[in-house]
């Protein structure tokens, strides 16, 4: 007997510290694996999800979006609370929406927003060590923000691209970038149509060099033009990086959630 198939979108929050990234791994634990296992129990059939952005090992999210198809009819409480019951404590479904069949978590996205959070203090934090990048030297936030503005617009971001990046084009368009501080936290807030592999973490590494006055503010503009990864600096750790928002057309009527993480 034929059963009608529905498409559902979910908002997913997770602490990526214990996972080898979002994407399913044959010999390592992934966020995708845990989400699919939990949803399959609720749906009573195997579920495969597609995400908006495949985060790396150790990267967190407060705004991941996924979609999946199902013929099972469940209420919102079952899809959210029921799924969470079978998820580990460091992964949560935070919202659910029915979406049209042409919706695609990745290809329907208009932009992605990441935040990298530095804990700029003389002593590290034992409470938030998994979710913050500790940096003990004093950083000049104003210089970092000035430098970041050179990245606005569409550019060839080869300089900030991993050598393992599989994207067919190095061109990306940064729509917004801001570096600001809240007490001991320095937040690098960046929005783009999409990102290259390791792009945000490589950018942050360069901004730190400028923040400690090792490099001039205009250095980031110059190395962007070089289009050479070796002209940049070393990549920063993944533990300070968060996928915080994915933007879609208002026609899909997805919820507008506060930009995380909650302690910012």
UniProtKB/Swiss-Prot annotation:
EC class: isomerase
Pfam families: PseudoU_synth_1
Active site location: 56
InterPro entries named in the record: PsdUridine_synth_cat_dom_sf, PsdUridine_synth_TruA, PsdUridine_synth_TruA_a/b_dom, PsdUridine_synth_TruA_C, TruA/RsuA/RluB/E/F_N
Annotated residues for binding of substrate: 114
EC numbers for this chain: 5.4.99.12
Any one GO BP annotation for this protein: tRNA pseudouridine synthesis
Keywords: Isomerase, tRNA processing
Reactions this protein catalyses: uridine(38/39/40) in tRNA = pseudouridine(38/39/40) in tRNA
Top-level lineage group: Bacteria
MF GO annotations: RNA binding; tRNA pseudouridine(38-40) synthase activity
PANTHER family, A to Z: PSEUDOURIDYLATE SYNTHASE, TRNA PSEUDOURIDINE SYNTHASE-LIKE 1
Family listed: Belongs to the tRNA pseudouridine synthase TruA family.
Subunit record text: Homodimer.
Function text: Formation of pseudouridine at positions 38, 39 and 40 in the anticodon stem and loop of transfer RNAs.
The name this protein goes by in its record: tRNA pseudouridine synthase A
């Amino acid at each position: 007997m034929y059963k009608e198939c529905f498409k559902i979108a979910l908002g997913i929050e997770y602490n990526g510290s214990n996972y080898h990234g979002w994407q399913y791994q044959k010999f390592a634990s992934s966020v995708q694996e845990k989400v699919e296992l939990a949803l399959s129990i609720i749906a009573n059939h195997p579920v495969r999800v597609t995400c908006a952005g495949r985060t790396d090992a150790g990267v967190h999210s407060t705004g991941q979006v996924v979609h999946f198809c199902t013929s099972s009819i469940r209420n919102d409480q079952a899809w959210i609370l029921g799924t969470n019951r079978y998820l580990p404590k460091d992964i949560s479904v935070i919202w659910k929406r029915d979406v049209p069949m042409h919706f695609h978590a990745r290809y329907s996205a208009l932009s992605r927003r990441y935040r990298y959070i530095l804990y700029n203090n003389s002593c590290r934090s034992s409470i938030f060590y998994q979710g913050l990048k500790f940096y003990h030297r004093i950083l000049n936030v104003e210089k970092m923000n000035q430098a970041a503005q050179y990245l606005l617009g569409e550019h060839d971001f080869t300089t900030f691209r991993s050598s393992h990046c599989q994207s067919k084009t190095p061109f990306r368009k940064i729509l917004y970038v801001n570096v600001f501080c809240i007490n001991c936290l320095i937040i690098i807030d960046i929005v783009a149509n999409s990102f290259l592999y390791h792009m945000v973490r490589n950018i942050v590494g360069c901004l730190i060099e400028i923040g400690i006055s090792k490099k001039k503010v205009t250095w980031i503009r110059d190395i962007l033009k070089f289009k050479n990864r070796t002209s940049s600096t070393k990549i920063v750790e993944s533990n300070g990086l968060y996928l915080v928002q994915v933007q879609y057309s208002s026609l899909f009527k997805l919820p507008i959630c506060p930009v995380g993480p909650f302690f910012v």
